[in-house]
């Protein structure tokens, strides 16, 4: 799962793997 564009939950993973502010 990737959290690109967000540091919040992405795709229901419960965490963001990659965060871009």
From Swiss-Prot:
Annotated crosslink 3-cysteinyl-aspartic acid (Cys-Asp) location: 1-9
Task: State if Disulfide bond is listed as a keyword.
Answer: yes
Q: Where does the source fall among the domains of life?
A: Bacteria
Q: Which Cys-Cys disulfides exist here?
A: 1-13, 7-19
Q: Does the keyword DNA-binding apply?
A: no
The alphabetized UniProt keywords are: Disulfide bond, Thioether bond
Function recorded in the entry = Active against HIV-1 virus in vitro.
Task: Give the protein name, as stated in the record.
Answer: Tricyclic peptide RP 71955
Source species of the chain: Streptomyces sp. (strain SP9440)
């Amino acid at each position: 799962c990737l959290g690109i564009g967000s540091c919040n939950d992405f795709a229901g993973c419960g965490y963001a793997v990659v965060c871009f502010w």
